[in-house]
Amino acid sequence: MKIDLNCDLGEGFGVWQMGDDAAMMQIATSVNIACGFHAGDPDIMHATVKLAKQNGVAIGAHPGFRDLHGFGRRPVPGITAAEIENLVAYQIGALQAVAALAGHKVTHVKAHGALSNVACEDDMTARAIASAIKAVDPSLVFVVLANSKLMLAGEAAGLPLAHEVFADRAYEDDGNLVSRKKPGAVLHDPNEIAERVLRMAQDGAVVSVTGKVIKMRTDTVCIHGDTKGAVEIARGVRRKLEASGITVAPFAGT
């Protein structure tokens, strides 16, 4: 069995830094890099891509809504499909250009924050994201929440998919993530998270907040770089998986 560990990195801006990217880069096998809309800037993007290349880590674009102040975690009411296509294509292209400068290659795309959350439940948003990815490069792997409308849109567009589960987030009974506004939405205990991820990988399922077992294909596991104790959590997850005979490797080539 093989599984990927992905992490959202490069989410600083100017002199402001978030998380320990250098430490996470030694644990993750794929990283999703902010492209300047919810976080990131040309210098941070370039430094993050170079760090990934040095560590043999696959890189992907992490497009979000244009919302630095809200870190891309706030929906944008009234946004059109064309506007979503444009902002996604723009951000993918930006990372592709920076990656070329750093001698690396973009292999995948994963939507960020509110853009992803809305798309998991809204057909128009999901289709617009998939359409933009396909137009830019149909070989890019689309990282999607398993069983979501994002997954269906990716399938309909004929994109290669990587089905994602979240190590440090709680699930609702419908398979969507519990809102960060609710208590218990983000998990922090490293041992609990490691055991949880092992069960996800072995069983192909997640357990919701009410105890419901939801079948989900698991190609990649996300550990958020901005979660408190992220490095310790990521190390624990990787150790647990490898100790159980599971190969930890990127879903796309580096």
Curated annotation (Swiss-Prot):
Keywords, sorted A to Z: ATP-binding, Hydrolase, Nucleotide-binding
Entry superkingdom: Bacteria
Pfam annotation, one family: LamB_YcsF
Record-linked Gene3D superfamilies: Glycoside hydrolase/deacetylase (3.20.20.370)
EC number: 3.5.2.9
Reaction catalysis annotation: 5-oxo-L-proline + ATP + 2 H2O = L-glutamate + ADP + phosphate + H(+)
SUPFAM superfamilies according to UniProt: Glycoside hydrolase/deacetylase
One annotated GO molecular function: 5-oxoprolinase (ATP-hydrolyzing) activity
InterPro entries noted in UniProt: Glyco_hydro/deAcase_b/a-brl, LamB/YcsF/PxpA-like
Nucleotide-binding is among the record's keywords: yes
Iron-sulfur as UniProt keyword: no
Cross-referenced CDD domains: LamB_YcsF_like
GO BP terms in the entry: carbohydrate metabolic process
Stated role: Catalyzes the cleavage of 5-oxoproline to form L-glutamate coupled to the hydrolysis of ATP to ADP and inorganic phosphate.
NCBIfam families per the UniProt record, alphabetical: PRK05406.1-3, PRK05406.1-5
Family according to the record: Belongs to the LamB/PxpA family.
Subunit structure: Forms a complex composed of PxpA, PxpB and PxpC.
Protein's recorded name: 5-oxoprolinase subunit A
Lineage: Bacteria, Pseudomonadati, Pseudomonadota, Alphaproteobacteria, Hyphomicrobiales
Gene from which the chain derives: pxpA
